[in-house]
Curated annotation (Swiss-Prot):
InterPro entries: Ribosomal_uS11, Ribosomal_uS11_bac-type, Ribosomal_uS11_CS, Ribosomal_uS11_sf. It comes from the Bacteria. This is Small ribosomal subunit protein uS11. Belongs to the universal ribosomal protein uS11 family. It comes from Vesicomyosocius okutanii subsp. Calyptogena okutanii (strain HA). The keyword Cell inner membrane does not apply. The keyword Cell division does not apply. Located on the platform of the 30S subunit, it bridges several disparate RNA helices of the 16S rRNA. Forms part of the Shine-Dalgarno cleft in the 70S ribosome. Part of the 30S ribosomal subunit. Interacts with proteins S7 and S18. Binds to IF-3.
Length: 128
């Protein structure tokens, strides 16, 4: 007889405070919620929320993605969020509204868009 391997069921940890990282590009919006140490709790994208093509880059798609990510975070017992927004995309503000609509308390909003201090040379100009 083969012995059954006893595996314990993984219990979900209760995380009350977290950080929401919103990466808004011109083509997509990625919402990722981490705990205070940077470990990923849940994530969602506007492309993964059922939007394809040019509709993926709309503010409404970002709001839906942030809402679904907020639902997943509530399942972990999350209540308070700090929001870090990165990028120039159209889904910046509406993603914050989507998180707020789920009942998560937003404590602070920080813009962490990387800005070069005259670093690398940009690529050549497009000629259409």
């Amino acid at each position: 007889m083969i012995a059954k391997s006893s595996s314990k069921k993984k219990s979900k940890k209760v995380i009350t405070d977290g950080i929401a990282h919103i990466h808004a590009t011109f083509n997509n919006t990625i919402v990722m919620i981490t705990d205070r140490h940077g470990n990923t709790v849940c994530w969602a994208t506007s492309g993964g929320s059922g939007f394809r093509g040019s509709r993926k880059s709309t503010p409404f798609a970002a709001q839906v993605a942030a809402g679904s990510c907020g639902e997943k975070a509530l399942a972990f017992g999350m209540k308070n969020l700090e929001v870090h927004v990165k990028g120039p995309g159209p889904g910046r503000d509406s993603a914050i509204r989507g998180l707020n609509a789920q009942g998560l308390k937003i404590q602070s909003i920080t813009d962490v868009t990387p800005i070069p201090h005259n670093g690398c040379r940009p690529s050549k100009k497009r000629r259409v």
